[in-house]
Curated annotation (Swiss-Prot):
PANTHER family given in the database record: CONTACTIN 3B-RELATED, PROTEIN SIDEKICK
The protein's name in its UniProt record: Contactin-4
Bilayer topology: Lipid-anchor; GPI-anchor
Induction summary: By retinoic acid, suggesting that it may act in response to differentiating agents.
Source species: Homo sapiens
Length: 1026
């Protein structure tokens, strides 16, 4: 649809001045979709959706089969917010193809087409069907013949009023509705009824029954399969769709159905087989699923094959859509839309809903549209259509043509433009105008003419090079086109240039030093100046790297850089950059940092022997200070970190890159590294060399701490410390144990072929108890035998004592302590005695659970503590030595005394007089099961002293002579034959400045009350107040 020229001009001006999001052409939010409407629906209303946005609000029209729908002439039609409502829809009048059209002042767009169809299912016309007569064993087809309908159908059959099930002998085609029986049996005789269901309306109708009877003229013989249900030769299938192929055969015996691809490829695993293989279903169909498929029906009489080609198709799908374009008059427009699909889509173009063809300035080639020298008549709504036989898609865009005179309202010339003397400046002139204007410049009131210094570009910008002071002033840009003239003025200010007076200079420094790189300038003081520094091309971040870098100077014309604690990583190029609003310049300096050498490279083991390794390496960077020496370090699995090693030459100078490491252990895996040094310091070590093992050699190190002793009767036990693996010098390491009776000449030898052996036991009845032997242990490996250790004397195992101790006696010391006495055995022992073992147990316990304590040497008594009071204990004593214990003495019994009193002294009162402290307390009475109180112990100490003094008394008072210049801590407890009883709470008597004082401890009637009191209240009063 073509709009009036005046409306387009007005639209262009409004579009130019308004926000793009405010005014625009129609845009579909929702387009109509196909509708299958059930004729028997109770709703009696159809809605075709069409939702559009635009400003101004678009007007919506509908077309049916290309003809406008007149909603005013037919009350059944109404348009609500763009969507078309049809009341009481009629199959004859309303079925067809609908399309929505949207129009506003910017143009017109049309929607995709949508079909309205009516779903229905009529009743069967006939009420009876002829009887079908077949032989037993014969195949049979019962025709359904569905009545007139619209919408997809599904089929089922009823056999004698019951649903007919499907198996390998029966099949219902969902394409034709027919019932197939591969081989009729006697049980198949009866009435068959076809049931047809419309899947849209769910309406169901039953056909007339068909009687099936068996003929009496014989049984059908065997015959090969005959395929009655087969899929078409070509089955086009959409991408992503689900395709179902049917195949069923009659035959005797009942045929089996097998599916396969003719090209030999396996059928996709996603495929499913139904109804005894009668249906092959392939979901989510893709290009790789296309091909020739075969259905093979086979029985013992033969086989038949049905074939069909599954072809792949895809509706068009956008790869590239078109977008809105806003252009000035006389410019060019190019649109391109791209879609994929199968078959390949073709393209059409619409302008304002009407076909667009190639003519004059408009060139169309497939998905491209080219409009040259655009004018106002080209404005409108454009649509690109991509179409193949399976569908069509739309892409919509708006072409806005701007026609307006020059306007500087949003793009005024810069009010002030700064430039330095000798510099170059461009004053931009960018008014909004369509078509493109012609530009003129003035300086002051004079027209500016171009010369070799002053030029005006095609887009209107003014360029001046080699600026002088005389170029300063006001400049005006004048823009003119068909629709008017406009101008804008700005000022050019010329400033003196900035110059670096003290640039940074290259320096040579040592690691750890600090320096200042100067950067001082002269500049126009009316301009702000900014200093920045870069290091090796990267700006220095003074916040992040403040540990090393700091800006110093203190003047706006100085931007010096201080570098503190310089490291090797700080070597490189430093650039001071100075910037004002009119110029930018820089000055650079190189910083050389001298430091310890870098790590040497490529440390290689050239040759290795049993104790030496020949190494070579390449020097690393010397960091600007010659390397003076190298040190070689080694590491083994047995060393703690890296260790310096001896070399030849002993001192390796900086010009030597090979050395021999000496003093290595044979048959040990080594790795080496090299460290370089110069006058500044020691550098980082090299990467380790490869690991190499030294060659084998005879062992040289003998076992340490050769000793022994102990063991069982007639045994000589010899022990030693194993030789560390790094000192074994080779594989097959072991020990040679040599021993002989003391004073004899001939050695007995035993070989132990284990590097881990550390003990040998010689057992022989001829070995006397505790007799001396000379012992030494040697070493060997695959290379041969090594030395023996020094000879040492080891005693054979001794015999345990043979006689028991005598005269056992025990007595009770308290409720918790017993003392036991015994005498040495009366008869001579064959085994020496190293001490005695006392065994004790309670009467109610078993002897095997007894506790034991040991004495050492000739001690013939011991004290047993931590026992229970009033308990009967049994005791026995044995002599022992390293071979074990001897026979037990006779058992003696002893009963511990009653426990001491559990109640502490209570009601403690104290007073002081003439350097004395007098304590009084209540008498403690023992319980029936406790020992009688024999007296009391008073324990006292200075508050700062750890040692305690004790006074015993059989009274309930005591007098202490103590100086008053210290605080005292005092406790009181009873004692009895059963031991010491419970102690009172501690009483603190403070340092007393007055000669007379009185106080009391907590009053306690039992132990529980005493333990619950956490503080002691002390009151002091002068004697005069008593």
């Amino acid at each position: 649809m073509r709009l009036p020229w005046e409306l387009l001009v007005l639209q262009s001006f409004i579009l130019c001045l308004a926000d793009d999001s405010t005014l625009h052409g129609p845009i579909f939010i929702q387009e109509p979709s196909p509708v299958m409407f059930p004729l028997d629906s109770e709703e009696k209303k159809v809605k075709l959706n069409c939702e559009v946005k635009g400003n101004p609000k678009p007007h919506i029209r509908w077309k049916l089969n290309g003809t406008d729908v007149d909603t005013g002439m037919d009350f059944r039609y109404s348009v609500v917010e763009g969507s078309l409502l049809i009341n009481n829809p009629n199959k004859t009048q309303d079925a067809g193809t609908y399309q929505c059209t949207a129009t506003n002042s910017f143009g017109t767009i049309v929607s995709r087409e949508a079909k309205l169809q009516f779903a229905y299912l009529d009743n069967f016309k006939t009420r009876t069907r002829s009887t079908v007569s077949v032989r037993r064993g014969q195949g049979m087809v019962l025709l359904c013949g569905p009545p007139p309908h619209s919408g997809e159908l599904s089929y089922a059959w009823i056999f004698n009023e019951y649903p007919s099930y499907q198996d390998n002998r029966r099949f219902v085609s969902q394409e034709t509705g027919n019932l197939y029986i591969a081989k009729v049996e006697k049980s198949d005789v009866g009435n068959y009824t076809c049931v047809v269901t419309n899947t849209v309306t769910n309406h169901k109708v039953l056909g007339p029954p068909t009687p099936l009877i068996l003929r009496n003229d014989g049984v059908m013989g065997e015959y090969e399969p005959k395929i009655e249900v087969q899929f078409p030769e070509t089955v086009p299938t959409a991408k992503g769709a689900t395709v179902k192929l049917e195949c069923f055969a009659l035959g005797n015996p009942v045929p089996t159905i097998i599916w396969r691809r003719a090209d030999g490829k396996p059928i996709a695993r996603k495929a499913r087989r139904h109804k005894s293989n009668g249906i092959l279903e392939i979901p989510n169909f893709q290009q790789e699923d296309a091909g020739l498929y075969e259905c093979v029906a086979e029985n013992s009489r033969g086989k038949n094959v049905a074939r069909g080609q599954l072809t792949f198709y895809a509706q068009p799908n956008w790869i590239q859509k078109i977008n809105d374009i806003h252009v000035a008059m006389e410019e060019n427009v190019f649109w391109e839309c791209k879609a994929n699909g199968r078959p390949k889509p073709t393209y059409k173009w619409l302008k304002n809903g009407e076909p667009l063809l190639t003519r004059d300035r408009i060139q169309i080639e497939q998905g491209t549209l080219n409009i040259t020298i655009v004018n106002l008549s080209d404005a409108g709504m454009y649509q690109c259509l991509a179409e193949n036989k399976h569908g069509v898609i739309f892409s919509n865009a708006e072409l806005s043509v701007i026609a307006v005179g020059p306007d500087f309202s949003r793009t005024l010339l810069k009010r002030v433009t700064l430039v330095k003397v000798g510099g170059e400046v461009v004053i931009e002139c960018k008014p909004k105008a369509s078509p493109k204007p012609v530009y003129t410049w003035k300086k002051g009131r004079d027209i500016l003419k171009e010369n070799e210094r002053i030029t005006i570009s095609e887009d209107g910008n003014l360029r001046i090079i080699n600026v002088t002071k005389s170029d300063a002033g006001s400049y005006t840009c004048i823009a003119t086109n068909h629709f008017g003239t406009a101008s804008s003025t700005g000022n050019l200010v010329v400033k003196d240039p900035t110059r670096v007076m003290v640039p940074p200079s290259s320096m040579d420094v040592t690691v750890g030093e600090s320096i200042v790189l100067p950067c001082q300038v002269t500049h126009d003081h009316s301009l702000d100046i900014v200093f920045t520094w870069s290091f090796n091309g990267h700006l220095i971040d003074f916040d992040r790297d403040g540990d090393h870098f700091e800006r110093v100077g203190g003047q706006d014309s100085a931007g010096d850089l201080m570098i503190r604690n310089i490291q090797l990583k700080h070597a490189g190029k430093y650039v001071c950059m100075v910037q004002t609003s009119v110029d930018r310049l820089s000055a650079a300096a190189d910083l050389i940092v001298r430091g310890p050498p870098g790590p040497p490279e490529a440390v290689t083991i050239d040759e290795i022997t049993d104790t030496t390794a020949q190494l070579s390496w390449r020097p690393g960077p010397d960091n600007h200070s010659p390397i003076t020496m190298y040190v070689i370090q080694a590491r083994t699995p047995f060393s703690v970190g890296w260790q310096a090693v001896s070399t030849v030459p002993e001192l390796i100078d900086g010009k030597t890159f090979t050395a021999t490491v000496v003093g290595l252990n044979p048959w040990v895996e080594y790795e080496f590294r090299t460290v370089a040094a110069n006058v500044i310091g020691i550098g980082e070590p090299s990467r380790p060399s490869e690991k190499r093992r030294t060659e084998e050699a005879l062992p040289e190190v003998t076992p340490a701490n050769v000793s022994g002793g102990g063991g069982s009767k007639s045994e000589l036990v010899i022990t030693w410390e194993t030789v560390p693996e790094e000192l074994q010098n080779g594989r097959g390491f072991g020990y040679v144990v040599a021993f002989r009776p003391y004073g004899k000449m001939i050695w007995m030898l035993t070989v132990l072929a284990s590097a881990d052996a550390s003990r040998y036991v010689f057992r022989n009845e001829s070995v006397h108890p505790f007799s001396p032997f000379e012992v030494k242990v040697g070493v060997f490996n695959n290379k041969g035998e090594g030395p023996f250790s020094p000879t040492t004397v080891v005693y054979s195992a001794e015999e345990e004592p043979t006689k028991p101790p005598a005269s056992i006696f025990a007595r009770s010391l308290s409720a918790t302590d017993i003392e036991v006495f015994w005498a040495s055995p009366l008869e001579k022992n064959r085994g020496r005695i190293q001490g005695y073992e006392v065994k004790y147990w309670r009467h109610e316990d078993k002897e095997e659970n007894a506790r034991k304590i040991r004495t050492v040497g000739n001690q013939t008594s011991t004290k047993i503590t931590n026992l229970k009071g009033s308990v009967l204990y049994h005791l026995a004593v044995k002599a022992y030595n390293s071979a074990g214990t001897g026979p037990s003495s006779a058992t003696v019994n002893v009963t511990t005394r009653k426990p001491p009193p559990s109640q502490p002294p209570g009601n403690i009162i104290w007073n002081s007089s003439d350097s004395k402290i007098i304590l009084n307390w209540d008498q403690v009475k023992a319980l029936d099961n406790e020992s009688e109180v024999k007296g009391y112990k008073v324990l006292y100490r200075w508050n700062r002293q750890s040692s305690t003094s004790v006074i015993e008394t059989n009274k309930t008072s005591v007098e202490l002579s103590l100086p008053f210049d210290e605080d005292y801590i005092i406790e009181i407890k009873p004692f009895s034959d059963g031991g010491d009883g419970s102690s009172s709470e501690q009483i603190r008597i403070p340092k007393i400045s007055n000669a007379y004082a009185r106080g009391s401890g907590a009053s306690t009637s039992n132990a529980c009350t005493l333990s619950a009191i956490s503080t002691i209240m002390i009151s002091l009063t002068a004697r005069s107040s008593l």
